[in-house]
Every structure is written in C-alpha cells, then in structure tokens.
Amino acid sequence: MIVPDQETVYHVISRSVLDGYPFGDEEKDELVKILIKFSKLYFTEVLGFCVMGNHFHLLVRMLPESDFSDDDIKKRYKKFYTDGRQIAEKKVPVYRCKWASLSELVREIKQTFSRYFNKHHNRRGTLWGERFKSLIVEDGQALINCLAYIDLNPLRANIVKCPEHYRWSSIGYHVQTRNKGNFLSFKFGLKDFGVRNRKERLRGYRHYVYEAAALKRSRGKSCRMIDEKIIAKQSETDFKNTRAYKFRYRSRYFSDAGIIGSKAFVARKYKQFKDIFQSKHEKKPKPIKGLEGIYSLKRLSES
C-alpha cells in the first residue's frame, strides 16, 4: 500500500533469494553507502535502518512531491550528478514524481546494490526475492516501537550484546559516527521526550531501546536480550518492564500487519485502501497484545 502525495512513514523489508548469509561486512558497508546516496536524492527522511546478512530493514518518511519546487528538483539533480550534466526542463515533472515514490527509491537501492554484488562476486542473476514488503506506520508510539524493533534485530540474532555495537543499524550509526552527514532523522516518534537537543533526543531513544531489550515474560521467565550489567552501566535510571514481549523474537506485526498505529489511524487508512482488500467483511483494527494503544489491520499468529 502506497499513499500518493501524502507524508507517510513506511517500514520496508527486502530479502535476498540466496541461501545462507551472503552479505558480509564489505557488502553491508556498501549497502549503507547506497542508502545514504539515494536518501539525498529522493524526497525522504530516513528514520531507521538495519542491514543483516540476508535482508535489510528501512524506516522512511516519504514527503509529498508538492512540497518541492522546480528549483528544488534542479538543485537536487545538479548536486547528485556531479559530472556537470543539466536536467532538461521537460524532465522536471518526471523526476518530481519519481523522487516522491517509495517504489522507485527501493528499486534504485536494490538494483544499484545488485550490480555491485554481482560484479564483486563474479555472478549473474537475481539477488533479491519477491517485491519488498512495506508497512504503513503511524507517527508516535507505533513509530518508535517499530524503530526499536528494527534496531534490535542484531540482538535477536545474537550477533552483538549491545545494540550500538552493530554499525549497520540506525542506532549504531547514530552512536558510532555521530550521524555522519546528517543521514538519519532525529524524529524518533515520541514527542514526550520533550527536548529539542539532538543529543538528548538520542539519549532518550537509547533508553527506550534498552527498556525494550530488558523485557521479561509475564510468567516470569527471562527473555532478556541485554545483560543486566550492561544495562546498569549504560543507563542512569532503572528501566521498568512495561513493554511487550514483541521485541525479544521476530514479530509479524512489524512486517506483515499492513498498517499499524492508533485505532483511528488504522481505521482511516483502511477506508482509504478498502478497494484493494478482497474481503467480504469489513475489516476492523485489531489491538496488538502487549503494545498498549497500538492496533493492526490484520490479526496475525505469533510463534
């Protein structure tokens, strides 16, 4: 589901068709470079990302094409193509439409990386699987939960002990590079952080992520992803175990739900896209257990 000419946040997931984990450190570095490159061209704010061994996550806010003038298009074109080429006047509307498209953004990212990967590994053929998945995410609580879920991928895979130690993720990029090149947005989703200072915003988000990673099951069995000593060292305050058990294991709600957000947001977006759903019955927002106030378009089974 793509919302045309409206500011919308999407969680994108795309997987390789290759067996195992074909993306090593060098490949992950290259894919991050490509993400940075095209984020400067397209009308987007990158909120989060995570490049894993066989797939990547991207959380982006796509901005409406109507926000950008002809001069904006020409300046972006000139800055991106540094060989001195000029954009033809008749092409300006074409690029305006293209650079506002989530589908075009993801297509260029995947095609550019495929060319690199195939050349680097002396191979031909398809690298990516089915068309990428995209989930519409509401600003606020749904957004920050989705962002934390993305940044905790390396911990769920037992690759690192601290989320910041994984440099191919948004939290790792923020901490290790100090957001080099202003690649990432500091709009983490919760206005109640109550601060404008970027360092304090990042600090608030890191606390939120550590809280999500320090959860316990309601039955008392620990499913902690970060060691208690690490949490104590990183945090100046105690974390309350108030968040759901959604972050410890892969959750389908952050990839297959179609739409997540408040009850009103999900209902409103469903009406907007009602025609594409082949259902005899009216769909209603379903509460996601453990994530208070967050609803899904679909009721999904969880392992």
What does each of the following model-derived ranges do?
Residues 1-203, 215-225, 231-303:
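Short catalytic/metal-binding and nucleic-acid-binding patches
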Residues 205-208:
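Intrinsic disorder/low-complexity flexible regions in very large eukaryotic scaffold/regulatory proteins
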